[in-house]
Amino acid sequence: MASSDTERDGGSPEKHSPVTDKHLEHSDLAKSPRGLKHYSKSRSRSREHKRKTDECRKHRSRSRSKEARRHEVKEKSSKKHRPDDSIDRDHSDKVRERLNSSENGEERHRRKEKRSSRGRSYSKSRSRERRHRSRSHDRRKSRSRSKERKRRPRSRSRSRSKHRHRSKSRSRSREKKKRIEKPRRHSRSRSRTPPSPPAFRGRNTAMDAQEALARRLERAKKLQEQREKEMADKQKQQETVAVAAAGGGSVINVAALLASGTQVTPQIAMAAQMAALQAKALAETGISVPSYYNPAAVNPMRFAEQEKKRKMLWQGKKEGDKSQSAEIWEKLNFGNKDQNVKFRKLMGIKNEEEAATSSVDVESFKTLKQQEEVFRNLDAQYEMARSQTHTQRGMGLGFTSSMRGMDTV
């Protein structure tokens, strides 16, 4: 629409009257605020964009990675260039309008004068300067922001504002003041409660160690003396027990101990009794309990009997020693030679000829005769019982005849 208006103005520069000139001036005045309005819109957009970016920076977390930050920088730079492109397009359109309107130099001169009188040309030049300044300033800002983002992971304190630097200087001065104040407080506390000097601490510990060693040595000496006394008392008790055992019974031993002045404990009494039993067993059997046995756990009389049995078992037999029972079993006669031979084989008797030809006493002869009669009667009864039970089973109950037969026998 702006280009068509300029063409109409350029087509008839001479025919216009002063009324038409006024009308054209009013149209130019109507055109110029459009451009100004358009420029103000782009400016407001850029300002809003800057505010948004500042808010985003404030609310951005420090824990983002480098890649995410680079991506955001690229997006922001692309968004910044978009309003600049729209401004360039508006500027090119205005240049074209001026070129088209250059045919009418007088009108252009009048317009310039009017605009200068109203302050439009000054505002346009100022707006252009501001645009150039804003572009250069934005570029510098983008560069400084990229540098700050690179430097952030190294030290966050560098990327902070100038007020922080001022606060640092203030904090340093405060720290100096605190350092100056601290030793004063410490000195006050020391003056209130004065501790012992450190030089005497080492001496005290050394003295304590020496005293502890001396105490340990004294305790060890006392323990050794007590042990020696106990050993001496035990030896005396053993000697007295041995003397009492050699002298006689337990009553005498206890009396001897009481007479000697030693305290009679139950252990000493038990030892005295066992010593008396050992002496008695030795006097009767001639066998003493060896020293490796506990006298309180071993009965000396039973031990002596066991030793006798062992000697009898492991001692060799003598030829002349034969007991009466052995002679009776050897001379036993069942009235039948076959039975006698079987019996001697079972009993392990070997000297058959000696038993037959040996001289027999009168008493032994009588016993042998009685044994023969007993064995004969037993054989006869066995035969009768066998015949009745095995061969005569069909003969009634078997009480009358069998009992009569037994009576006759």
From Swiss-Prot:
Domain of life: Eukaryota
Coiled-coil stretches: 204-244
Signal peptide: none
Chain residue ranges for the region called Disordered: 1-204
Keyword Zinc-finger: no
Keyword presence, Coiled coil: yes
Residue spans of biased composition, Basic and acidic residues class: 1-31, 64-108
Keywords: Coiled coil
Extent of Basic residues compositional bias: 34-50, 109-191
Family, similarity comment: Belongs to the RSRC2 family.
Protein name: Arginine/serine-rich coiled-coil protein 2
Organism encoding this protein: Xenopus tropicalis (Western clawed frog)
Taxonomic lineage from the root: Eukaryota, Metazoa, Chordata, Craniata, Vertebrata
Gene from which the chain derives: rsrc2
